[in-house]
A protein has these predicted regions:
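Short, extreme N-terminal leader segments that mark the start of a protein/domain
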Residues: 41-71
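Charged, compositionally biased boundary regions
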Residues: 127-209
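Compositionally biased, low-complexity flexible segments
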Residues: 1-20, 27-31, 35, 39-42
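Compact, well-ordered interaction domains used in eukaryotic information-processing assemblies
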Residues: 48, 70-128
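Solvent-exposed, flexible loop/coil residues
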Residues: 5, 75, 139, 143
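Generic structural hydrophobic/aromatic packing signal, biased to beta-strands
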Residues: 56-58, 98, 135
């Protein structure tokens, strides 16, 4: 099955779904949403830029355990804003952010001091989505041409989670699985990295499921 651009679709005929705990994350979201509204008023972004993102979550380390929070989709209106949102969160060993758009693509970003690592599940998403296009620009990778859209290929640092135990081949295999929704791909990665429960809760909040 292919999408409107003739690319293989990521979505399978049945979404396995996930059960999770739902809580109030207004306190977490408030600061980020306020920053977004100020930027929107200044003309830096529009609601149409934001609406394409289905979820954004942040993962960070506190003493001896992992924490994860849902973020407003507004923080992924542009890549710089997403990175800055991750930098604002104090953490032992840096922060990780995940974002997903429909059944098209997902993005992982790790921030440690001034170092930023990124992994984009499908570089052809840059044809349609500004966030994906900005990732390719940051990686100095050209946006695919029309005759390069037949194959879904990832872009970025395949070793982004190698220090946490996820090898390059494993991450590549997740990105290549066209039957996974972005949220399920992210949940699977998080489980492998031993912060699965925290990310599941954050995804449930972000997706309202």
């Amino acid at each position: 099955v292919r999408d409107g651009r003739g690319r293989p679709r990521r979505r399978s005929s049945q979404n396995p779904g996930r059960d999770g705990l739902i809580g109030d994350f207004a306190a977490v979201a408030g600061g980020y949403l306020t920053a977004f509204l100020r930027a929107e008023h200044a003309g830096a972004m529009t609601m149409s830029d934001v609406s394409e993102t289905d979820f954004a979550v942040i993962v960070y380390r506190e003493e001896d355990h992992w924490e994860a929070d849902a973020l407003p989709a507004a923080v992924t209106a542009d890549l710089d804003g997403f990175v800055q949102a991750l930098r604002r969160q104090p953490s032992i060993g840096g922060t990780t952010g995940f974002a997903g758009v429909g059944d098209d693509f997902w993005l992982a970003v790790r921030v440690l001091g001034e170092d930023v690592s990124m992994f984009l599940s499908d570089l052809t998403a840059a044809v349609d989505y500004p966030l994906a296009r900005q990732v390719l620009e940051a990686l100095d990778i050209p946006v695919p041409s029309d005759d390069e859209l037949d194959q879904v290929l990832p872009a970025g640092d395949l070793s982004i989670f190698a220090d946490l135990g996820l090898e390059e081949m494993e991450l590549g295999a997740v990105a290549a699985d066209l039957d996974l929704y972005p949220e399920d791909a992210v949940a699977g990665i998080a489980e492998r990295l031993r912060f699965g429960e925290a990310v599941e809760r954050a995804l449930d909040l972000a997706l309202g499921s």
